[in-house]
Amino acid sequence: MKYNINVHSEIGQLQTVLVHTPGNEIRRISPRRLDDLLFSAVIEPDTAIQEHQTFCQLLQEQNIEVVQLTDLTATTFDKANATAQNQFIETWLDQAEPKLTPEHRKVAKQYLLEQKAKSTLSMVRSMMGGIDKRKVAAANTINGDFLVDPMPNLYFTRDPFASIGHGISINRMKYLTRRRETLFASFIFANHPIIAARKFYFKPIDMGTIEGGDIFVYDQQTVVMGLSERTTEAAINVLAKKIQQDSSTSFKRIFVINVPQLPNLMHLDTWLTMLDRNKFLYSPNMLAVLKAWRIDFTDPALKWNEIAGDLSTILHTIIGQKPMLIPIAGADANQTEIDIETHFDGTNYLTIAPSVVVGYARNKLTHQTLEAAGVKVIAFKGNQLSLGMGSARCMSMPLVRKPL
């Protein structure tokens, strides 16, 4: 691994990608806490893990370097100095949910250090998987089953940070249960000796909330963002200002697209994705609330200028040519078919090269529609993973794409 962040498109050949094959954290999703943990159902963990391993294998078979978040965090920790190592642990304790009392903080830290004595990887997995109170002293003083809650959404590596050109956005997630996830990216990019980002376009201390599923890099000059339940106007303004101030960037503008405010379909990439220079997959359900704006970096005020027109007109404005629009489930789909395939993230394919995508096999109508439009679909079974409300794009963060 010797590279800098380099993502200047959604469709350039994917060379290196960050993923997280889930562990104990998904074994700890209680039916009592589905809303709290942002899941639609309790998933079968062994099957979900196997599904994710298949996903990773498919990517590797396409000559894509697959980097695991656990491995990268552990490697970074081992290469960091003692001060950075201690700060990483202390920050994790600061952010723990539920909030730790001074006594419970000591217990949690001791547990992590015991895991570290086994291996750094064991410690990292414990940070992600949470701490079962039965594993520690003073269990009878702890309410609930966990001294520290798990992070079951971590396998959606798209959201905690985003690669934008040669820079990154380390995001402030909307919900508390996910906000802790950005700790790992913050630590990696501050301490890894090789992996580097030239600029930081957003940090968790910045105003508003922002998540990677709402961030798209269409080309070297254009970023597209979703204004959604998870990504706010304030956060988009912060990111726009920081890109504008970066004299080394090639980006000229941001386009913002309004996203329906539905809890199970929370990001722009659950409604609209780019498959090739002019090919887009979309859910017709987004059209009722469609709005878009343009922010030019030549404008010191970064004013939001509304774009009039339908989806085809808006995308034509963004890419400079007439788009080929591919509806979820096909042009002849009825509302039930559209709703089902939208619900199971039928737009959320990961584009690994122009007109080559990876996604769930369960979206059969969309799969057929894509192939009829000249898009190669590499499908894998993800019936359990999909219950976390995300598909292949959600489960991946590109680090390096080949320039177009």
Curated annotation (Swiss-Prot):
Domain of life: Bacteria
InterPro entries linked: Arg_deiminase
Catalysed reactions, as listed in the record: L-arginine + H2O = L-citrulline + NH4(+)
Keyword Glycosyltransferase tagged: no
Biological process per Gene Ontology, one example term: arginine deiminase pathway
GO annotation, cellular component aspect: cytoplasm
Family to which this protein belongs: Belongs to the arginine deiminase family.
Record-given protein name: Putative arginine deiminase
Organism field: Mycoplasma pneumoniae (strain ATCC 29342 / M129 / Subtype 1) (Mycoplasmoides pneumoniae)
Primary gene name: arcA
